[in-house]
Design a protein with these regions (language model features):
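Ribosome-associated RNA-binding proteins
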Residues: 1-178
């Protein structure tokens, strides 16, 4: 069990129950899954998709799936069935391991980092943020990066409101800017 998972079970749940918002430990919101997505413009180079797949596998510890376009969009030069990105969904132990590395190792490596934007919530308790450079993750070898792809990180919680989700993520160690 990762340190973040233990911290959640022992400290975060107790603090949220003591705050008076929840009467039962099972009512406390929890992180359900983390979705990592890399959108890739692979029109010109075919190896960009495989490179993105390898980097996302290195970062997440799980093999990502290739996402294909559902419809053709002429303005974007996208045809139906073309690979447009890679995605991986983390749950359970891998999710907590990733979040621990993300909060403690990756986010502080962002240049001029002052905390994550608190406006990234969707109204239903999920938080999404974009990462412009995959080199912030310690697992990625800098000399092997050919393309700076970036990614979207979505943290899905069981919270009903954004305030509950923000409180949960703040107690887990996510550094929000003020």
């Amino acid at each position: 069990m990762s340190q973040l998972h233990e911290h959640y079970k022992k400290t975060v749940v107790e603090e949220l129950v003591k705050s008076g918002k929840y009467t039962n430990r099972m009512q406390v919101p929890r992180v359900e899954k983390v979705v990592l997505n890399m959108g890739v413009n692979s029109k010109h180079e075919k190896d960009v998709i495989t490179e993105a797949q390898q980097e996302l596998a290195t970062i997440s510890g799980q093999r990502p799936i290739i996402r294909h376009a559902k419809k053709s969009i002429a303005n974007f030069h996208v045809r139906e069935g073309m690979p447009v990105g890679v995605k991986v969904t983390l749950r359970g132990q891998r999710m907590f391991d990733f979040l621990e590395r993300f909060f403690n190792a990756a986010l502080p490596r962002i240049r001029d980092f002052r905390g994550v934007n608190p406006r990234g919530f969707d109204g239903r308790g999920s938080y999404t943020m974009g990462v412009r450079d995959q080199a912030i993750f310690p697992e990625v070898e800098l000399d092997k990066i050919k393309h700076n792809l970036g990614m979207d990180v979505t943290i899905v919680t069981s919270a009903n409101t954004d305030a509950e989700a923000k409180e949960l993520l703040k107690l887990l160690g996510m550094p929000f800017s003020s």
